[in-house]
Amino acid sequence: MNDPQLNNLLKWGIQNSDASRNDPSTAPQPLSEVDKEALQQLIAGVRGPSDADLMQDSFQVIENNEATAEAKHQAFENFEQLIQGIDNANNMEALGLWTKLIKQLESEDPVIRKWAAWCCSTAVQNNVRSQERLLVLKNAIPTLVRLATSDPDKTARKKATSALSSAVRNFQPGLDAVLEHMPAEHKPKEALDANDMASVDILINKLRESI
């Protein structure tokens, strides 16, 4: 072992082992700040990257112009699986990933647009905190409405419709924003109640039937 910090950790571990603690002549030795840092790094290495690290890694691939389309699609699939956990979905804001995600809705690649809409849907489903975040993001709702009503790729339209469905249920401000940007031919004539699933379905089913 050539790393001095790891050598110090090993020495500290031996000194503070059960055998040493049972020896009256051996007093426990505290870790120095440098050794504490080394211990944290060692533990992190054993545990592997955190979900936050993996989420950021996914977007490094997605935003890499040199990455293949296949690699980007796989990165998006990995990201979508991660944000199925509500804590990870809520952590998107702190990691600065919401703005990056919305930007991908404008991708020239229809598969990327599909995945971006899919991830929006996953993040906001039954999650009022993420619903609120999507609402205030510039162009997020208008872009999803445009994709749901006019994207040339049917799969992207379906996922955008799913994202709108998740964004408005039990969240009246989101429903009001979607209706505000909805083209007239897709907008129901009656008033809609976000807390009434049958009411919301009037809008969502109308969108799905148009695909």
UniProtKB/Swiss-Prot annotation:
Organism (species): Phaeosphaeria nodorum (strain SN15 / ATCC MYA-4574 / FGSC 10173) (Glume blotch fungus)
A Pfam family of this chain: Fes1
UniProt-annotated location(s): Cytoplasm
Region entry Disordered, spans: 12-31
Record-stated family: Belongs to the FES1 family.
Name of the protein in its database record: Hsp70 nucleotide exchange factor FES1
A GO CC term attached to the entry: endoplasmic reticulum
Gene name as annotated: FES1
UniProt superkingdom: Eukaryota
Biased composition (Polar residues): 12-29
UniProt entry keywords in alphabetical sequence: Cytoplasm, Repeat, Translation regulation
Broad class of the protein's primary localization: cytoplasm
GO-annotated molecular function: adenyl-nucleotide exchange factor activity
Function: Functions as a nucleotide exchange factor (NEF) for Hsp70 chaperones which accelerates the release of ADP. Required for fully efficient Hsp70-mediated folding of proteins.
ARM repeat windows: 27-67, 86-125, 129-169
InterPro entries associated with the record: ARM-like, ARM-type_fold, Hsp70_NEF-Inhibitors, Nucleotide_exch_fac_Fes1
PANTHER family according to UniProt: HSP70-BINDING PROTEIN 1 (PTHR19316:SF18), PROTEIN FOLDING REGULATOR (PTHR19316)
One GO BP annotation of this record: regulation of translation
